[in-house]
Curated annotation (Swiss-Prot):
The keyword Hydrolase applies. It comes from the Bacteria. Residues 1392-1423 form a propeptide. It comes from Streptococcus mutans serotype c (strain ATCC 700610 / UA159). This is Fructan beta-fructosidase. Residues 69-126, 1368-1385 have a biased composition (Polar residues). GO terms for molecular function: fructan beta-fructosidase activity; sucrose alpha-glucosidase activity. Induction: By sucrose, fructan substrates and fructose. Residues 924-1002 form the BIG2 domain.
Amino acid sequence: MEEETVCKNWFMRKSGKSWIFGCAVFFVLGLATALPVAAEEISQTTAADTAVTEVRTEDSSQTSSQETAVTETTQSEGTASKQLTTPAVADQTTEPTDNEPISSSDGASSPYQVTDTTEPQQTLTPADSEPQAKADVQQAAAPKKEEINPVTNLEDMSHDTNGTWEVREDGIHSNAIGKGDSFLYSQSSGKNFVYATDVTFKQNSGAAALVFRSNNDSNNKNMYAVNVDIGGHKAKFWRWVDNKDIQLIDERDVVPTADNRYTLKVVAVNNWISYYVNDILMASTGDYVLQKADKGQNTVIPEGHFGLLNWNGDMVFQNTKFALLDDTTAPLIDNITVRSDRGNVEKQGQFFSEEPLHIQYVSNDASQVSLDIAKHNPAATVTVEDKTGRVYTDPSHLPVNVGANYFTVKSTVIDSFGRTVTLTYRINVHRRQNDEVYYNELYRDQYHYSVKDGWANDPNGLVYYNGVYHLFHQFYDDTKWGPMHWAHATSTDLIHWKEEPIAFYPDSNGYMFSGCVVVDEHNSSGLFKTAKGGLVAIITANGNGQRMELAYSEDEGKTWQKYDRIVADWSNDPLQNQDFRDPKVFHWNNQWFMVLAGGPLRIYSSNNLKDWKVESTYPDLHTECPDMYPIVANDGVLKWVLSRGGRFYKVGDFKQVDGKWTFIADDAYKDKDQVMNFGKDSYAAMTYYVHDFGTETRPTIPKLTEVNWMNTWEDYCNLVADTVGQDFNGTFNLNLDLGLINENGQYILTQTPVKAYDSLRDVNTALHFKDVTVDANNTLLKDFKGDSYEIVSHFRPDEKTTKVGFNLRVGNGQATKVIYDLQTETLSIDRSQSGTILSAAFAKVNSQHVTKNADGSIDLHIYVDRASVEVFSKNNTVAGANQIFPNPEAVGASIIVEGGKAQADISVYQMKTIWTDKKDTAKPVAMNTTTAKELALQVGQSQDLQVYLAPASVRQDVEWTISDPSLVRTSQKGNVLHLTAVKKGKLTITAISKENPSLSKTFTISITLNNFKTNLKGLQSVTGKWYVDDETLYDSNTSSNDYYMASQKPGFKEYDYDIDLKYQRGLINLFVASGNIDPSQAYSVQFGDSETVRLYRFAGDTIAEANMGKRINDDQYHHIKVTKTKNSIIISVDGQEVMSHNFDQVDSYFNDAYVGLGLWDGAVEFQNFFVTDHATTPKPDSDPTPQPDAPEALAQERELIDPATGVRVILQKGELASIVRVKVSHIETNDAHTPAVLNAKDYDLFNITPIDKNEKVVAITKPATVLLPIDAGKVVDKVVYLPNTDKEENLPFTIVSLTDSNGKKQSYVRFTAEHFSEYGLVYQAENQTNLKSKEKQDNVAISYPLNLEQEVKVSSISRKYAANKTADVNSVQQTEPSVMSSSPKATLPDTGDHKTDLSQLGVLAMIGSFLVEIAGYFKKRKD
C-alpha cells in the first residue's frame, strides 16, 4: 500500500466572483496533474467524479487533534458504499484528479472524519474494535440501511467542487459560503415520491434546496429544485432546462423559525409537484389559488435522481430521505362529488385526480353542500378547509355564499419514515344567483351567446361533430381576466346554446390559453382505441413562454385524457419568440397543418398531431389567434384566407415553395390587409372545424362559419362588469358564414350572419317601410321601442344627401349612431353618447371606407342587442361590431338623413331571446348601477347617483338614505339622486328598492376642499380616479394609465414646468408637450423606482435617459423643473440639473402644447403645479464664453475612460465636445440594490453618465461605442439595458480583448448605446474558461470571427489619461486579432499524462508557484 499524502498548504484567491484554489503539494509531489482552476470553471468533472463518504474517528467523543489517516467504510447488500467527503471548512477544498475521489482531512471534533487518500476505500469500522468484531457489526447492520446511515437513505452520494460536504452522525454538513451553488448528487432516483429534509442554517445567509428528478450533470443541468433562502426568508421552486433556470413560482414568504430549522418536502405524482415548508404549501403546479401568475414549463421531467443544493450557506441537512409512491400508496383522490339537500347540483364535469383544481356549480337555493370524496388510497386521511381556515373532518353541510367558494381538500398518508405525505386539492363550489336574475340582466344580450357567470374571451376549439356544434372558450371564474380555463358550450343550431362543465383547468405545463379542436377521424394520432378516432384538442399552455399540449376525447368532448408530452414548444421554434400560441389546425393534402402566432406567424405540419415540424415562418407578420382556411370564390377559384385575429385578413395561396408549405399573399395583399371588422369589439375569430379539406386535386371544402369574442384587449375589457354592475363579462359576436367574391380582380371576404338568426324575428310585430321618402325631419320610427332588434335597410339618396343612417337605443340624451357618410364614403359607429363610457378609447368613433353600391345606393343591415350593435354592408363585405351600455330606458330609434332626401326600404324586427331557461318576472330581481361605489368630490362639485332595477320592464322606484345630510344638498327624480357637496367630510348614501327592499346599493362619498395650487386652467381627470384633498392631488391604480390634463394650453412657446411630487410606486409621467388632452405621443418625462429619469414619447420611443444620482422613492416631496425651449428640454430635480437635451426637429405642436400628468400602475401625490413663461423667468448668470479646449462639436472621435471601473466610452465625431468624462457607478451580484430582473443572476451593472467640465450631466446626441470589462474566467450570457428595475432589453454585442503596454490583457463586451443609463453584463450560470455555450444566443453572435474578436494594445491607461480621463481613439493600436473558440466540444487544456514521471515535477512546481502569484491579477479592480 502506498503512503498517503495529506495536503495542508492551500492557496485561495478571488477572481471576480469566483475563487481560485489549489494545493502546492500537488505540484511538488505529482499526486495530480491538473492545474488549479476556478471551481466554477471545471468543465469535465461530473457528479461521479467526486464522492461523499462517512469516515469515523477512533473516538468521536474525544477532542483530540490527532488526524486519522485511513478509515473503513461498510458496504452491504442493498446498501450503497459511502465514499470520501471533503471537510466542512470553506478553505480546505481539494481538486480531484481524474477518476479519484476528493480527499482531505479534518480534526477529530466531528464524529465522521474525512481523510485524503488515493487508496481504495476501506470499510467503516469503529477504531477500538477488533477486526472480527468489525465484520460482525458490518454483517449485522447490512439489512437496515438507516442503522448504517440514519441521516439519509441517498445512495452513492457525490458532489461538485464548489464548497464542502460531509456526512456525520448528526446530518450532512455543507459549507459553500462565497462559493455560489454547491451540489450534492446521488444515484438514488424516483418518479413518484415524497422527498424531505430538515435543514438547519448555522448562519443567517444562504439557501438550502432539495434537488429531484435530476440528471446529475452539472455541465448540462436538467432537474428540479426547491429551496428556502434564510436571508430573505423566501421559498422558491424552479427547474433547469439545459442549464437555464426557469422559475415555476413567484418567491413566497417563509415564516422565520427561532432555531433556523426548516423542513423542506416535495411530493411528486407524475406531472403534479407539490412543495411544502414546515408543512405549509409553497407550490403546487397548476394551483392558481396559491398563485395566479403563469409559471409553466415544457414537458415535465418524469423521473431522475435525488440531491441537495447549498447556495452560499453553512448548513446541516438531517433526515434527508425519500420514499417512493405508487398507485397504491399515493394519497390521490379519485373523485369529489358535490351534493346538496337544499338545492340542485348542476351536471358534474370531469374530475382530474392528478390536478389540483375543480369547479362545481350549484343552484342559488343550495346554501349548504356536502362533499363525497372518493379516496384512491383507503389509508388516506382527508380534511376540508374553507377560506376562513376552518377545518372540517366531516365535509357535510358546508355553508356556501353566492359566487365562488373555494374549499381546500387535503389527502394525507404517512410514509415509512413517519412523515406526512399530502396532496392539496381545491374545489370551487360556485353558488348561482337567483334563477330570475339570469338573462334578465340589463346588459345581457338576448340573442348573442354569453357566459352565464364569470369571464369569457377567445373562442377556442370550435368543432362540428356528430351533429353538434362545440364552442370552447377562454374562461375564469371572475369578472376580470385571470388564470385561463377552457369552458364549453354546445348547440345544434348555432343560436341556442347549452353550458357544459369546464373542460380544461390550468396544469403543470401552464394555464390553458387558446387553441383548437379537430376530428381525428382515422386515428392518425394513434391516441384512440379504435380506427374511427375522436376529438383532439391542441391547447396553448402559457407560462415561461408558450407551448402546445394535446388532449383527446373518445366520448364527444365529455371527458378528456391529456397526452403526456408537449408537442411543440417556443424554445424549439426557429424564431425564438416566446409568443407561440393560439394554434388552429386543419387537414389538407393528407397531412395536418397548424398556424400559430401570438407574435410572428408560423406554419407547422404533422402526420400524427404529435410530431410537428416547421414549414414556414413570417417574422414580420404579427397577429394573435390566426386562422387559415380555403374558400371557393364566386368565380370557382379556390383561394386561402389568412385571418389575423378577426381584425384583418389576407387572401392568397397555400402551396409548397422550395419544398416548404407557405402562404403566398395575392399581389393586392402583399403590403396591406383588408379590414375584417372595423368595430372595436370583435376579436380572436375562429372557424368551426367540420372535416378534412381534401387535397389540391380533390378539395372537399365545407361551409365555414366563424365566431368572435365581442370585446378588445386594447383598453377596457376588464372594466365592463364592474362598471355596469353585473356578474358576467364575456359575450360573443354573431356566428357568420364565410365566402369570397372577386371584385375587380381582388378577392374580398364576405361575412354573413347565419340564416338561423332569421328564426328569431318576431314577424308579428315587424315594421316594414317600402320605398318611403325620408329626410331630416322624418318621424318614421317615433313610436318604436326596443332593446333587441334587427334592421334591414336600403337607401337610395338624392344628389344633395350627405349622410344616412340610424340613431339607436335613443333616450335620456343618449344615442348610438350608425352613419354612412356619402361625401367621404365612410361607414361609422359612434357610441360617444351611447350611455356609460368605459374609457376614452371606448368613446372614439370607429369607421371604415366603404364604396356605395354600383347604383349609388347603400345597404345597412344592423343587429341591435341590449349591449351591442353589429352592422353589415356592401354585400356583407363590411362588418363592424361594438358594445354599448345605454340607459335601460333608452329604447327609441330614429332614421338619420342629412343634406337632402332618400328613398328607403326599411324593415325592423324585434328579436326573440335565445335563453330558453330565462324566467319571466314582474318584480325587480336585481339592482345595478353604472356609478362608482366610491366617489371623491370637492366642495361645490355635483354628482348624479343612479341605480337600475332589473328587469328593465319593472317600475324603477327606489328610496335613498343619507348618513350625514349636512354634507350634501340633494334632489331626487325617479331612480336618480342629484347631489352637491357643500361641506368637507365623508358619508354613505344607500338606494333601496321600494318593491323589493332586499335589493340595495351603497355609495361611499369623500368630500374634500380643493386648495391645489396651480395656474393651469381646466385641469381635469381624463382617465383614472384622481382627487384633490386640500393642497394635494392624489392618484393610484393597478396596471393602467391615468391622465390628468389641462384643457387649456399654457399659451407660451417656451415655458418652465414646475411641480412637487411624492413618489410611492409605479411610473410617474410629466406630459411636458402634448398635441391634445389625450397624451398619446406626448413629450414626456418619466420617473420610477430607480435613479434614472427618462425623456420619451408617451407610448413611444425613448429619447434620452440620465442618472439623477439618487432615487426619489423616499416618501418625500421632490421639486421637478422642466424647462422647455423651442428645441430643447432641461430637467432639474431638487435644483440639480440632471438632463439637457437638444432636438434636431420637433413636432408642430411642441411649441403650442397641452400639459398634464400621468401615472402607470402606481401611486403618487402632487403639489404646486405651475407652468410659467420661460422668457420672463429670471435666469441665473452664466458664463457663455466657450472654453478654447471645448469646441461645439468634436472634430474626431474621443475616448472616455473611467479608471475605477475600466469602462470605456468612444464618442463619435460630431458629438458635443462639452462631454469631458463619464461618471460610472457599479454594482454586482447580490448587491442590496440589485434590480428585480437581475435577482439570482451573476452580473455586473454599470450606470454611465456623461459629464461636462462643470460636473453637469450631458445627454449624447449621437450613438456611442461602449466597452464594459468582463470578469476573468467568466462567459457573458447577454448584455442588457435596464430602462427600469422590472424590465430588461437585450443588446447585440461583440467581445474584444485589450492589451496595455505592460502586456496585461482585459476582455470587454462592445456595443452601441443610443443614450446612457444602466447597462449590465449577465454571466452564464456555469462559467468555464472555455466556451461551452450555444454558438448563438438572442441578439448575440458568439462565434467571434476575426473581425469581431480583437486583441488591442494600448499604452498605460491610468498614467496617460489621469488628468482628463479622455483620449483619442487613434491612440489605441490594434495588433493581430485573436479568436475565441466557441465550439461545444471545447475542454480544459490537457494537463498531461497521469503517468507523468518525476522528471517533470520540477516544472509543475514552478507552474504552481507562478499561478499563485498571478491569481491576484484576476481580482476585480474595486477589490
